[in-house]
Amino acid sequence: MTPEWSPLFGTATWDSMTESERVRLTRSEVAQFLGVGIWLEVGLQVALLRASHSADPARSDVKFLFNECADENLHSLMFVNVIDSIGSHFYRRDRSLDFFGWLFRTIAWDEVAYGIVLAGEEIFDVMQRDWMASEDVAAPIRRACYIHVVEESRHMAYARQKIRTRLIKISRVRRFISTLIIAMGTHLVAKSLINRRMYEDLGLDWKVVGPEIDANEHHRIMFRRAAEPFIEFLSREGLLNFGARWIYRKSNLL
């Protein structure tokens, strides 16, 4: 990734690192970010395929879903191969995120499932547009980001339309509940991008870098920038009430 997207950029720890240490750090952070993206996309596929398991496979919407899943699986394979090519690896997630993933796959309904995944897609889209344009980023990452940005634009448009369509038919109570659950899910996704195990694997003291990340205003600014398109969409569609705003602020996304 570009150095500016590292949660540690501008901190005392960052300033004390050599260039090779910064490269190793940002490559590990890319692996963490993309690992969360893969986990999120697989969860959505499981939820949608379960809902369509008994449907007529010749239906146009089911065929479209098959195409979407095929694309997402190719993206996941691409990211796995890219992370391997730069000498990094994926890191184990926190157990709370795995529990949330189980809930997401099992009970998330349409606008909630698409809303949480759209949050991740929108945030990664902003990040990857920077990464693919920077000479500071490893060539395999730049190529993968370019492919993903181009192909994912159709998926994001589809997710937005699915959310809009569902919102037409739902009650005020369901809209209120969905708004809060989307916010809570997005909060967990955003927080999962910071993985204690990854920093400790690099030999960094979490008791030092954890507070540095929490206090890093540059990191908060970059995350808010990444979330801007998603927050604007929520505002337009009436999915941004007082409670949701509070959660997004806690996530450094608003």
Which role fits each region the language model picked out?
Residues 1-254:
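Non-heme di-metal
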